[in-house]
Design a protein with these regions (language model features):
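Conserved Radical SAM active-site core
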Residues: 70, 77-223, 233-262
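Radical SAM enzyme core and accessory elements
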Residues: 9, 15, 286-302
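Conserved PDZ fold ligand-binding element
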Residues: 27-45
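Terminal peptide-recognition signature
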Residues: 25, 33, 61, 105
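Short, structured beta-strand/loop micro-motifs enriched in basic residues and often containing a Trp
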Residues: 13-21, 41-44
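Short, small-residue-biased leader/transition segments that mark boundaries at the very start
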Residues: 1-8, 304
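Flexible glycine/acidic-rich beta-alpha junction loops that bind and position SAM and/or redox cofactors
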Residues: 204, 224-250, 270-294
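PDZ-domain C-terminal substructure recognizer with occasional recognition of PDZ-binding tails
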Residues: 51-87
């Protein structure tokens, strides 16, 4: 351990909130309130950078202590071992908000008077990797794609809604939403594992439109390893919002037959069921839920 005076122009600082007992950080006498300045003389843009730079057997950390001293710490560790700290901001950067105005958005349908954080609409690929959030790709830049492919951050969970570009623009109320589908090609070619989701809206992206979407999405299997289909959720707080209808039993049974037909195709072709109807469809149809083996290990579930 060496004290070091160092000036990095425009360096990003990351405040350490907690040090885990028995961790590398505790052994190095890193404490809550210390600040991580760099790893291997590289500034850390966000949690992607942090994880990528920490994946090595030898790393050099620059830490600023609470008293203002800067410590340069040379660490020898197992390749996959983490430092063992929690940062004040888990993303180590600002959260990216959603640029869409989806006709089915559940946040727009929430009652007033709840805590402020519940009304924040995120659409951040980093949260997709870290927490399983679904992203629309509309605010994902080429730089973001390059980093995801470079760091091989998998899986990325994508909200497709439809593979019809014009319809996707309408559903997301974003004129770039159709063009954003081209980013799926880059993720696929970069061998980035994906899961997909379709929020089904009656008379909009169901039936024939869904058939078209599943046909297009099946071309990305098995890199795209699952597509979950969920019915749009409608609340009583819909004043001024796009008029949407609830599905009925007949709709649910049609959807399930459509899904099961595609499952047979995909099992034969790739050995996975690929497309999954959420529990709501089976309950609405009056059917028993499928056996566990049909879910391919529950790839579509969000694990936090």
């Amino acid at each position: 351990r060496r004290q070091r005076q160092m000036c990095i122009r425009d360096r990003v600082e990351h405040l350490i909130k907690e040090v885990y007992p028995g961790s590398i950080a505790e052994e190095l006498e890193i404490e809550p309130g210390d600040v991580l300045l760099s790893i291997n003389d590289q500034s850390i843009e966000d949690v992607f950078d942090y994880r990528y730079l920490m994946n090595d057997e030898f790393v050099t950390l620059l830490i600023r202590k609470k008293n203002g001293e800067e410590w340069e710490l040379e660490v020898e560790k197992e390749y996959e071992d983490d430092l063992g700290v929690e940062f004040e901001n888990s993303l180590m950067d600002e959260y990216r908000s959603c640029s869409n105005h989806c006709i089915f958005c559940f946040i727009d349908q929430m009652p007033p008077g709840m805590r402020e954080t519940l009304y924040f609409k995120d659409d951040d690929s980093r949260l997709s990797f870290l927490q399983g959030n679904y992203v629309t790709l509309t605010n994902m830049s080429d730089y973001d794609l390059d980093r995801i492919i470079k760091f091989h951050l998998s899986p990325i969970n994508v909200s497709f809604q439809t593979m019809n570009p014009k319809l996707r623009c309408k559903m997301l109320h974003n004129r770039f939403a159709g063009d954003a589908l081209a980013k799926v090609d880059r993720l696929y070619k970069g061998d980035v594992t994906m899961n997909g989701q379709i929020v089904l809206c009656k008379g909009i992206n169901d039936r024939d439109e869904l058939e078209y979407s599943l046909e297009k999405l099946s071309e990305y299997a098995p890199v795209l390893q699952s597509v979950s289909i969920v019915p749009v959720g409608l609340s009583r707080y819909r004043k001024g919002l796009y008029p949407l209808e609830s599905f009925d039993k007949e709709d649910a049974r049609y959807l399930i037959s459509q899904v099961e037909r595609w499952q047979k195709i995909m099992v034969k072709k790739h050995g996975i069921h690929f497309v999954h109807a959420s529990d709501e469809w089976y309950i609405l149809a009056g059917y028993e839920l499928p056996e566990e083996g049909r879910y391919d290990g529950y790839l579509s579930l969000i694990h936090i």
